[in-house]
């Protein structure tokens, strides 16, 4: 158990200064470098940024990002990560909500962000080399101060900034390092982008355990040949990803224990782990333990989990998402908010120290999703589950029209909102198509097109996707667009999304 994330990482630097903290394709950075660089950056940030304000950090999978995060934490600032593969619109949308006084350019910004201070890479590098280090951690992020703010999809096309405090993160990290059997010095894969809270599952537990993060940038993961060649060279003990990503790795017949002798832990979150994927991993990696975990960003990465053994795979065609972590209470309610009996489907409620204080600058959405339970915070997950009498939870679906595709959470209304801005579209509605394992296989849009000059639907679809791609993240672009003269409506005049869902999943 640790009592402070920042001092725990600094302690590793004091005890094991030459140990490698971060390895980017063979370029290695030690804990001493991480401490010295983050201390100097913290000194620089303390002088140059307004006290206590959240700061946007723009960049990819690099050591500099981690160093900047830690420098901001030490100087009393929450960080708001935005990945380099985000559309330009995302940066503007986040800033419209966050009103951050500064943007830190670890990688060059693709657009101009008006009325905000920009700290560019040369200034960062100069500060990390020569600025006087921060003289104490008395103003560092602690307790209920925000540690990071991650933006998720929002229903109005406006993303929601989930505020995660130091103590939220501490609760999660302590559970991760105690319940998943990870050892000091663990070598962990660092693949999810920092703007996706799954990245927290590898980042902070690894650093407080004095381990090594092996960066796997998108340029590698997008090229399967390069990915399959790179993975065995990493010497991993721990694999953290969405199930979708490991399903890509399983396409390589050489992805098995004999080529990964030290790989002993698989941790999954972000979407449903299906039975056949778990079975493939258990068969190919007999020395490894497969952990299935579940949790919304609003409750800090994950709140339930369990080891998926051969017995569990044999017993449950649809795998459980595990038991609540010890400091957290989960329970299931019906539409009236009444607790239901064991085995009855309902909405999962989460109460505990890892539940967020709410959405940044969005009191209405916060009031709708969060509640007080005694002296603790609670969150209405919007997830349909069943729970056994002994507390084992099974995921069943969403209560609303929010889905997960490849681990990314997508509000269908958000996609619709943007699709309906596209110049070729009169009206559109997006629905998920599920595969036989109840996972979202693709997004399909039904659209009423405006009059146009395209000689084929294919060309029209290409034009719509190109325009939409300037507004939303790549994973939010529907794979197929089906054209109609009109969309079905409900009795109260809204597009009947349930009818469209039924049509594509018949």
UniProtKB/Swiss-Prot annotation:
It catalyses: holo-[D-alanyl-carrier protein] + D-alanine + ATP = D-alanyl-[D-alanyl-carrier protein] + AMP + diphosphate. Gene3D superfamilies: 3.30.300.30, N-terminal domain of ligase-like. One of its GO terms (molecular function) is ATP binding. Its EC number is 6.2.1.54. Pfam families: AMP-binding, AMP-binding_C. ATP binds at residues 152-153, 292-297, 383, 395-398, 494. InterPro entries: AA_adenyl_dom, AMP-bd_C, AMP-bd_C_sf, AMP-binding_CS, AMP-dep_synth/lig_dom, ANL_N_sf, DltA, DltA-like. Catalyzes the first step in the D-alanylation of lipoteichoic acid (LTA), the activation of D-alanine and its transfer onto the D-alanyl carrier protein (Dcp) DltC. In an ATP-dependent two-step reaction, forms a high energy D-alanyl-AMP intermediate, followed by transfer of the D-alanyl residue as a thiol ester to the phosphopantheinyl prosthetic group of the Dcp. D-alanylation of LTA plays an important role in modulating the properties of the cell wall in Gram-positive bacteria, influencing the net charge of the cell wall. This is D-alanine--D-alanyl carrier protein ligase.
């Amino acid at each position: 158990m640790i009592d402070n994330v920042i001092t725990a990482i600094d302690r590793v630097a004091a005890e094991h200064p030459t140990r490698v903290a971060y390895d980017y394709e063979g370029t290695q950075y030690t804990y001493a470098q991480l401490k010295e660089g983050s201390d100097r950056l913290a000194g620089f940030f303390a002088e140059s940024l307004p006290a206590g304000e959240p700061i946007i950090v723009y960049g990819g999978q690099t050591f500099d990002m981690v160093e900047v995060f830690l420098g901001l934490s030490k100087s009393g600032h929450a960080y708001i990560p935005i990945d380099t593969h985000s559309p330009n619109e995302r940066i503007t949308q986040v800033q419209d909500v966050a009103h951050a006084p500064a943007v830190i350019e670890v990688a060059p910004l693709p657009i101009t962000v008006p009325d905000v201070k920009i700290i560019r890479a040369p200034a960062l590098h100069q500060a990390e080399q020569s600025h006087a280090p921060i003289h104490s951690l008395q103003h560092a992020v602690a307790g209920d101060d925000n540690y990071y703010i991650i933006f998720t999809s929002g229903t109005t096309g406006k993303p929601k900034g989930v505020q995660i405090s130091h103590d939220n993160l501490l609760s999660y990290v302590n559970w991760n390092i105690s319940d998943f059997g990870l050892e000091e010095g663990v070598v962990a894969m660092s693949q999810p982008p920092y703007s996706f809270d799954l990245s927290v599952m590898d980042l902070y537990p690894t650093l407080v355990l004095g381990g090594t993060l092996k960066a796997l940038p998108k340029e590698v993961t997008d090229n399967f040949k390069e990915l399959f060649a790179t993975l065995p060279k990493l010497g991993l003990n721990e694999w953290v990803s969405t199930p979708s990503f490991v399903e890509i790795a399983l396409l390589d017949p050489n992805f098995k224990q004999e080529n990964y002798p030290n790989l002993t832990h698989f941790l999954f979150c972000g979407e449903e782990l299906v039975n056949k994927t778990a079975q493939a991993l258990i068969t190919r990696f007999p020395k490894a333990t497969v952990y299935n975990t579940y949790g919304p960003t609003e409750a800090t990465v994950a709140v339930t989990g369990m080891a998926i053994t051969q017995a569990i795979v044999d017993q449950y065609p649809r795998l459980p998402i595990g038991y609540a972590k010890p400091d957290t209470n989960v329970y299931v309610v019906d539409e009236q908010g009444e607790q239901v009996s064991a085995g009855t489907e309902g909405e999962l409620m989460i109460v505990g120290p890892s539940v967020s204080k709410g959405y940044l600058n969005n009191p209405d959405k916060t009031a709708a999703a969060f509640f007080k339970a005694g002296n603790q915070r609670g969150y209405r997950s919007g997830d349909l589950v069943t729970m056994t009498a002994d507390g084992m939870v099974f995921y069943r679906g969403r209560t609303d029209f929010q889905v997960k595709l490849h681990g990314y959470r997508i509000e269908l209304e958000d996609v619709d909102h943007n699709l309906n801005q596209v110049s070729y579209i009169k009206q559109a509605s997006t629905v998920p198509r599920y595969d036989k394992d109840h996972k979202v296989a693709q997004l399909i849009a039904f659209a009423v097109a405006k009059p146009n000059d395209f000689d084929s639907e294919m060309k029209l679809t290409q034009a719509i996707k190109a325009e939409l791609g300037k507004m939303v993240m790549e994973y939010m672009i529907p794979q197929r667009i089906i054209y109609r003269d009109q969309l079905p409506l409900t009795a109260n005049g809204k597009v009947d999304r349930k009818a469209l869902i039924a049509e594509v999943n018949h």
